[in-house]
UniProtKB/Swiss-Prot annotation:
Annotated InterPro entries: dCTP_deaminase, dUTPase-like_sf, dUTPase_trimeric
Subunit annotation: Homotrimer.
Reaction(s) this enzyme catalyzes, per UniProt: dCTP + H2O + H(+) = dUTP + NH4(+)
EC code: 3.5.4.13
Disulfide bonds: none
NCBIfam families found in the cross-reference section: dCTP_deam
Keywords: Hydrolase, Nucleotide metabolism, Nucleotide-binding
Family: Belongs to the dCTP deaminase family.
Record function comment: Catalyzes the deamination of dCTP to dUTP.
The name this protein goes by in its record: dCTP deaminase
Length: 188
């Protein structure tokens, strides 16, 4: 397996629509203001978070059960800023739509700027032939409220190419989160 370079990522985004919309450089400022960077990097792609968030709340006592997820434990917020309560959690989604090739898997890592503020971002791997907007999990590990900026970089995807295509892809297995649009809640 090899990690893929900016040249390969750009070629795949432009010829195969692997990432859409695609930004072919690192963007670090907007209107002369510093932002959390996004776009193509040397060996990855920094994706942006959209303005749709689902924030966990305790207004209705509930137990988080991945097999019977109760949406009442969430509040939906459409905003350029998401405030995550202390020691809490929020879901977001990428602006970019991903369409993975059959011989490639992508691993997501968080932005160091967020990590240094106690904000951890988790995403499971984008498996071969996975397609859709990617739901991002933001965890505020601090005892203080934390701010997430919509439209700015949230995480980086690293693309690993196998030496041959897989036998069974995410699409072949009818992956439950395929072709997701927006924040997608857990389902079993």
């Amino acid at each position: 397996m090899s990690i893929m370079s900016d040249n390969w990522i750009k070629k795949m985004a432009e010829s195969e629509n692997m990432i859409s919309p695609f930004v072919d450089k690192q963007v670090r400022t907007h209107n002369n203001q510093h932002i959390l960077s996004y776009g193509l990097s040397s060996y990855g792609y920094d994706a942006r978070v959209s303005n749709e968030f689902k924030i966990f709340t305790n207004t209705k006592p509930s137990i988080i059960d991945p097999k019977k997820f109760d949406q009442d434990c969430l509040i939906t917020k459409i905003s350029d800023i998401c405030i995550i309560p202390p020691n809490s959690f929020a879901l977001g989604t990428t602006i970019e739509y991903f369409k993975m090739p059959r011989d490639v898997i992508a691993i997501c890592i968080g932005k160091s700027t967020y990590a240094r503020c106690g904000i951890i971002i988790n995403v499971t791997p984008l498996e071969p032939e996975c397609e859709g907007h990617i739901t991002l999990e933001f965890s505020n590990t601090t005892p203080l409220p934390a701010k997430i900026y919509a439209g700015e970089g949230a995480c980086q995807f690293l693309f690993l190419k196998g030496d041959q295509p897989c036998n069974t892809s995410y699409l072949d297995r009818y992956g439950r989160y395929t072709k997701q649009i927006g924040v997608t809640l857990p389902t079993v």
